[in-house]
């Protein structure tokens, strides 16, 4: 299979870099890459949102704030590159064609953000579409898709399997400005729907056994066209 992994920045760097988890995810990705083609997109997470929030004190320019977030995603991506050692391409990849070329070298391309207005979820969905990936795996700090925000509604119900259309409907409720933090943002959900991309959305616990998760052993949400 050809698989794109979308790893949330808050998963890798909750308050500070989670070195143990980064080592675990690097091991899992290395193991998976032995039998599958792998590409990775890394998000900015809480750190990016804090910088973007601080920048609001100085500028209303959303594009400028997006660039701040992009730089932080790439710093997080470099951490994962370091953990993957020789298995990863040694530089952060910034375009899809380069990601494809790196995969032909049997290396794992690691991307961060690319363009203002696109979250890393959207980048991952577009990369999956470009590469004609068999599966997009979204690793977030929530263990799947819920019918409402589980942080605000204790009775929120997790959805084990949904359509891409339903994902778009749920994602439309999330924040679309720089630093938005929905499980999957609306633009990414629309790209997933357009590309008819089979998508698995899982939390940090499932990510620790990522090799099993891609085989169906997970507690997350499977999104299908």
Curated annotation (Swiss-Prot):
Pathway: Pyrimidine metabolism; CTP biosynthesis via de novo pathway; UDP from UMP (UMPK route): step 1/1. Disulfide bonds: none annotated. ATP binds at residues 9-10, 45, 49, 140-141, 146, 149. GO terms for biological process: 'de novo' CTP biosynthetic process; UDP biosynthetic process. UMP binds at residues 44, 66, 114-120. One of its GO terms (molecular function) is UMP kinase activity. Pfam families: AA_kinase. It is found in: Cytoplasm. SUPFAM superfamilies: Carbamate kinase-like (SSF53633). Its main location: cytoplasm. The keyword Transferase applies. InterPro entries: AceGlu_kinase-like_sf, Asp/Glu/Uridylate_kinase, Uridylate_kinase, Uridylate_kinase_arch/spir. Its EC number is 2.7.4.22. Keywords: ATP-binding, Cytoplasm, Kinase, Nucleotide-binding, Pyrimidine biosynthesis, Transferase. It comes from the Archaea. Homohexamer. Belongs to the UMP kinase family. Catalyzes the reversible phosphorylation of UMP to UDP. This is Uridylate kinase. It comes from Thermococcus sibiricus (strain DSM 12597 / MM 739).
